[in-house]
Amino acid sequence: MMNPFFQNTSCSPYYRTDQPCSLGNYVSYAIPVAGVADIVAAINFTQTHNVRLVIKNTGHDYMGKSTGRGALSLWTHNLKSRQLVNYSSAHYTGPAIKVGAGVTGGEALVHASASGYRIVSGDCPTVGYSGGYSSGGGHSILNSVHGLAADNVLEWEVVTADGRHVVASPDQNSDLYWAMSGGGGGTFAVALSMTSRVHADSIIGAASLSFNATSAPSNDSFVSALNAWWAFLPSLVDVGATPSWNIFAGNFLVPNTTAPGRTAADMDTLYSPFLSELKRLGIPYAFESFSAPNYLQHYNDTDGPLPDGPLAAWA
């Protein structure tokens, strides 16, 4: 559970052993889903007995939708099937990956990379690839070149609220397909699997940058540098680069810029106008450019290595 409010701090492992422990906002019971029958049975039970039903894969939900006080939970984390397929429809023909609802972004990335492909997945490797991530939009460091994760979904295999097992795509159950592709996890149906585009892998250019207000000639020059950054951003996005950046307590940090198909020399060229502006403002900075032969290696270099890394441990 991502937000402590939804845990209700009712049973923290850091409490004294003699302190009372209760479920709080956690669910009362959970079903480890193995297939369609488990989902249908849960839906029928909760409707018959007027019990709240929630869906959980990995629990990465800041809004607490993967838990609920007194609820019955469908835990989809064990649906780990994954395969590369040759997909064909009126809207797309080409390679794709079909994953069970329990597959994490890290697992899907490793599977796709072994065959020379990359996927649009999140920074954190333990976030479930389908379900809440892709159906909620799906932010990624590949968004500038490949769009959101939801843009790449070809079809959903789901169980609806009335217990029907269906496939939703632009060609069949299209309203449900569009609702699932950005409408939020656990809202319209229970996802069993998801099929999404994969993209041919390539060299990945990368860069990092940092500067701060302390070493700037003045606060005004630091603010001018920030304004210059806003103006510079579109030039990165327009060529398919995605910078991850932070501003905090007088510090500006770009820990990573991801640019598919670019070399380290390309990154120097891309950043040259902004670095020239920092020099004009008299602001010292630290800049580094580098590259990786493929996206998985780039991910390991910046956010990994998988399965562990600075963002999360393998779930």
From Swiss-Prot:
Q: Keyword Lipoprotein on this protein?
A: no
Q: Give each disulfide bond as a residue pair.
A: none
Reaction(s) the record says it catalyses:
betaenone C = betaenone A; stemphyloxin I = stemphyloxin II
Q: What is the lineage of its organism?
A: Eukaryota, Fungi, Dikarya, Ascomycota, Pezizomycotina
Pfam family example for this protein?
A: FAD_binding_4
The family database entries (Gene3D superfamilies) matched by this protein are listed as: 3.30.465.10
Which pathway does UniProt place it in?
Answer: Mycotoxin biosynthesis
Molecular function terms in GO for this entry?
A: FAD binding; oxidoreductase activity
What are the alphabetically sorted keywords of the record? FAD, Flavoprotein, Oxidoreductase
User: PROSITE patterns annotated for this entry?
Assistant: FAD_PCMH
Q: Which residues form the FAD-binding PCMH-type domain?
A: 19-201
- The organism named in the record is Phaeosphaeria nodorum (strain SN15 / ATCC MYA-4574 / FGSC 10173)
This one is known as: FAD-linked oxidoreductase sthB
**EC number(s) per entry:** 1.-.-.-
Question: What family is reported?
Answer: Belongs to the oxygen-dependent FAD-linked oxidoreductase family.
Q: Which InterPro entries match?
A: FAD-bd_PCMH (IPR016166), FAD-bd_PCMH-like_sf (IPR036318), FAD-bd_PCMH_sub2 (IPR016169), FAD-linked_Oxidoreductases_BP (IPR050432), Oxid_FAD_bind_N (IPR006094)
What highest taxon heads this organism's lineage? Eukaryota
The UniProt function text for this chain reads: FAD-linked oxidoreductase; part of the gene cluster that mediates the biosynthesis of the phytotoxin stemphyloxin II. The first step of the pathway is the synthesis of dehydroprobetaenone I by the polyketide synthase sthA and the enoyl reductase sthE via condensation of one acetyl-CoA starter unit with 7 malonyl-CoA units and 5 methylations. The C-terminal reductase (R) domain of sthA catalyzes the reductive release of the polyketide chain. Because sthA lacks a designated enoylreductase (ER) domain, the required activity is provided the enoyl reductase sthE.
